[in-house]
Amino acid sequence: MLVFAGLGNPGAKYADNRHNVGFMAADAIARRHSFSPWSKKFQGLIAEGTIAGEKIILIKPQTFMNLSGQSVGEALRFYKLELSALTVFYDEIDLAEGKLRIKTGGGAGGHNGIRSIDGHIGNAYRRVRIGVGHPGIKEMVQHHVLGDFAKADREWLDPLLDAIADNAAMIVKGDESGFMNKAALAVQGKAIAELEKPAQKQQPKQQSHIRQARSQQAPAKLPETGPMAAMLKKLFGNKD
C-alpha cells in the first residue's frame, strides 16, 4: 500500500489557486484511475484505488496548508506505513511553470505544507514538486501562490496534470526519471503543437443581406434627358 498526498487549501475560494496544484494532481489521478468517491477521514478527504497492482490511498488534507502534517501523519500511522510509502504532490515556486521534479528527502524550501509534514513524521518521503514559477520579488510570493492560475496557464497545466495521472504507475514502480521525462514531453509537445498551428485568416466582417445586396448592385445612373432630368437640374443645379 502507498499513500499519495496532494497539498492545498480547502474551500471553493482556493480551488484554482497555484497553491492548490497538489489537490489538482490528486483529483487528476483519482479520475484517470477510477478511484472511489472522496470521503472524509484523517482530517482530510481520501479516495482509494489501484495503480499498477498496488493499492493507493489518495489524501487531500482539509486542515489548511500549514497543518497538512496532522492529516498526512494520521493516515500513515493508521495504516502503519513507513515514510518510503508516501508521495506528496505540491507547488514549487523555485521551478519554472510547467517544470516537474521528484526527490526524496531534503528541506521544506519555504513551503509551509512540507514544513508541517516534516515536523510531524520526518522528511524521508518522496516529493513531486510542480513548478508554478516565481513572481520575481519575495514580497509578492504569497499573493502569487494564493492567486488563481490564469487562462493562459491551462496551456501547460492541463497537459502536465494529464501526464501526472497517466504515468502515475511509474511512481509506483519507482521509475522517477521516466516519470519526469514523460511529464516534460507532455508539456513540450503541447507547446510545439501550439506553435505549429497555422495562422487563421481573418474572416471579413459579416454584413447584413441588405448591405451585401447593395454592394453587388451597380451605381444608379441619373437620367440625362426628359422631365426627371429637368427636375434634378432644378434641385441640384447644372454641374456642367
Curated annotation (Swiss-Prot):
InterPro entries: Pept_tRNA_hydro, Pept_tRNA_hydro_CS, Pept_tRNA_hydro_sf. It catalyses: an N-acyl-L-alpha-aminoacyl-tRNA + H2O = an N-acyl-L-amino acid + a tRNA + H(+). SUPFAM superfamilies: Peptidyl-tRNA hydrolase-like. Residues 209-218 have a biased composition (Polar residues). Residues 196-227 are annotated as: Disordered. The active site is at H19. Hydrolyzes ribosome-free peptidyl-tRNAs (with 1 or more amino acids incorporated), which drop off the ribosome during protein synthesis, or as a result of ribosome stalling. Transmembrane segments: none annotated. Monomer. PANTHER family: PEPTIDYL-TRNA HYDROLASE (PTHR17224:SF1). Its main location: cytoplasm. TRNA binds at Y14, F64, N66, N112. GO terms for molecular function: peptidyl-tRNA hydrolase activity; tRNA binding. The record marks N9 as: Discriminates between blocked and unblocked aminoacyl-tRNA. The record marks D91 as: Stabilizes the basic form of H active site to accept a proton. The gene is pth. Keywords: Cytoplasm, Hydrolase, RNA-binding, tRNA-binding. It is found in: Cytoplasm. This is Peptidyl-tRNA hydrolase. One of its GO terms (biological process) is protein quality control for misfolded or incompletely synthesized proteins. Its EC number is 3.1.1.29. Signal peptide: none annotated. Belongs to the PTH family.
